[in-house]
């Protein structure tokens, strides 16, 4: 069984991930993982944190000469923003934000300072999940299994994949889009919805679609 564990706080020194259960002998490269991290950072509507971080993975165990050893794989991603927070004396955070883990987390862990919850439930944690997912994606390519995810809806705009492009061409279009939607026209309209919502200080709902090719029936 393959398992993974992540640790680290949003404004701590680093994020850490451990993966166990992967077999030995599979090609896994830092460059492939970093390409996923770079795609994660490019989307329109991302917060100011993306201007501070320049994510690159550090592989400290489980991969030697770009091959998995069969032992646990340990990954690290540095938080550049840590230096801006490490010496600050910060007052407790006591007002929960709607739609976040703040309220549930404080109830579960009996926390008096919401910062103890938000540091772990921050979207920053998904950087490590992205790196771990990249390893899985690269290993699956050995079996001619390819995966592509794209944004299929933002606000009132929706895109439905017709299946006319190969999955690699689809991924190229997704990568070129500022909103990760493979249709140029709909991408522009999604961009406009995001900009309008920002101006109104509002939020938008959205949806994603994931496609896999080569999966055995």
Question: Predicted segment positions?
Answer:
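Generic N-terminal targeting/processing segments that precede catalytic cores or assembly contacts
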Residues: 1-126, 130-217
């Amino acid at each position: 069984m393959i398992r993974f564990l992540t640790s680290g706080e949003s404004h701590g020194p680093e994020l850490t991930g451990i993966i166990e259960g992967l077999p030995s002998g599979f090609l896994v490269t830092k460059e492939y993982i970093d390409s996923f991290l770079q795609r994660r950072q490019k989307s329109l509507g991302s917060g100011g944190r993306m201007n501070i971080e320049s994510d690159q993975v550090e592989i400290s165990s489980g991969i030697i000469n770009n091959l998995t050893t069969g032992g646990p794989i340990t990954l690290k991603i540095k938080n550049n923003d840590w230096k801006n927070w490490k010496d600050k004396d910060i007052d407790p955070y006591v007002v929960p934000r709607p739609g976040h883990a703040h309220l549930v987390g404080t109830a579960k862990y009996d926390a008096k300072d919401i910062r103890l919850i938000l540091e772990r439930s921050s979207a920053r944690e998904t950087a490590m999940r992205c790196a771990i997912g990249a390893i899985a994606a690269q290993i699956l390519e050995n079996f001619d299994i390819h995966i592509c995810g794209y944004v299929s809806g933002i606000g009132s705009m929706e895109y439905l994949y017709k299946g006319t492009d190969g999955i690699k061409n689809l991924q190229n279009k997704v990568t070129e889009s500022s909103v990760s939607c493979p249709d140029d026209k709909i991408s522009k309209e999604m961009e406009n919805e995001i900009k309008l919502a920002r101006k109104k200080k509002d939020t938008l709902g959205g949806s994603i679609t994931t496609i896999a090719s080569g999966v055995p029936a």
